[in-house]
Structures are given as C-alpha cells and as structure tokens.
Amino acid sequence: MKNLPLEDNVIYTYLNDIVDTILLRDVISRNNIRNTDFYKNLIVYLAKETWNLFSTKKISDYLKSQNINIATNTVIEYLNASKVACFLNSVSRFDLKWKKIFEILHKYYFSDIGIKNALLWWYSKINISWILENVVYNDLISKGWEVYVWELWNKEVDFVCKKGEEMMYLQVSYLLESESTKQREFAPLLEIGDSWKKYVITMDENASGFIDGVQWINIIDFLVNIK
C-alpha cells in the first residue's frame, strides 16, 4: 500500500478490490445471500443516502419503485449481515423530550470511508458534508460514545452523543459560506434547552467562537481535542 501510485484509477481499483472481497467473501458467501445484485444495490443506495433517516419499509418501497421487488424481512436480514461484518453501522433516532430511543428509523454509516468512496466512485453528486459526517461518527464510536440522531419538526441534530452521564450535541457541515447556512446549522442546537456542550463542526479554517452557547469548531480541532 505504501508504494501504491496516487492515481485515481489505481486507487479506485485497489478500493474496489477491497469492496469485492468484503462484500463477496465476508457477507454474501458467509450468509448464503443468493440475490447478490440486490444486495450490492442496497449497499450503494445506503452509501448514496447517508444523510437520510431510513426504515426498512422505506428502503423496500424505494427498491420496488426501481422495479426491484424484495421483502422487508430480506432487507432486515441483509442489513444485519452487513452490521455483523462490521462494515456498516446503524444509528437510531433519539427523542430528546422523552429521552427514548426509537428503533424504527436509522441512519447508516460505513466503518471505512474508502469502502464508501469506492461504492460511489461513479456518482457525481457526492456531498462532502456526508463524508465528514461519517468521519465524525467513526471518531465518536472509537472514543466510546453512544451515538444517536434527533429529528423533530423538519430540523435535525446530526448526532446526540452519550458517554456515561455526559452528553453532547453535534452538527456537521462542510463550510458555513453564508449567513443563511450558518443559521440553518446552528438553529436545531439552539432549540435544545439543556446545558450540555453543543458543537457545529466544519472545515472552515476560521471556525471558532460561540453563538448562544453553541461552539463553532474546525473538524481537525474536534477530532484531536474532543475526547
């Protein structure tokens, strides 16, 4: 790997070989998945729609709209196989008011960003914010945080994080290039009434300061300094 040329086609070939090995050997073969084309389409769909909250029925309905008929139970079976293989992780929705976890809706993140990039190599609409969100999720899990997502009244907090009795809330975005973007990212956090730490995480080099108790922080600073 150290001597691999940093050329797009070489990188793609290398990552794609890894994807084929993981999908074909570690998931499809071990779980005796017969509908391999559907399984691959399912994983690509999840990679492309990272930002979305899903139910297994919603996934099944979408696939039916693409003329792919598959039972909801089969979707559940394939998703569970992917999680057991440790390349796909699900995040449940958290109700801040009632402090409850809902198991119906989930977001899905990839344990290796390279796998996700290989799956989406052909896709021209990759949103950098989706990649950053996945990076932050992986970092949180590695540091022992429980991670959930909150959605209410069409506003979403990307991550509700718990570690023991401690909590924090995170929004992840690429750049806050306009005042309207800044307001959109800060607004959900400003509606949370407790005193736990709240962060808007971006790649802006000048990311710093607070707005009504919500800290704006550069993603590198967050990954390095927030334990």
Task: Identify what each model region corresponds to.
Residues 167-177:
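Active-site ExK catalytic segment of metal-dependent nucleases
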Residues 3-167:
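Accessory nucleic acid-recognition modules appended to NTPase machines
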Residues 149, 195-202:
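Short, hydrophobic beta-strand segments that form beta-sheet elements in well-ordered domains
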Residues 146, 197, 213-215:
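Conserved beta-strand segments of alpha/beta enzyme cores
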Residues 109, 170, 199-201, 215-217:
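Hydrophobic/aromatic beta-strand patches that form the interior of the parallel beta-sheet core
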Residues 176-187:
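Active-site-adjacent loop/helix micro-motif of nuclease/hydrolase catalytic cores
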Residues 187-196:
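Arginine/glycine-rich "motif VI" loop of SF2 helicases in the C-terminal RecA-like domain
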Residues 205-227:
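Domain-level recognition of nuclease-like catalytic cores that cleave nucleotide substrates
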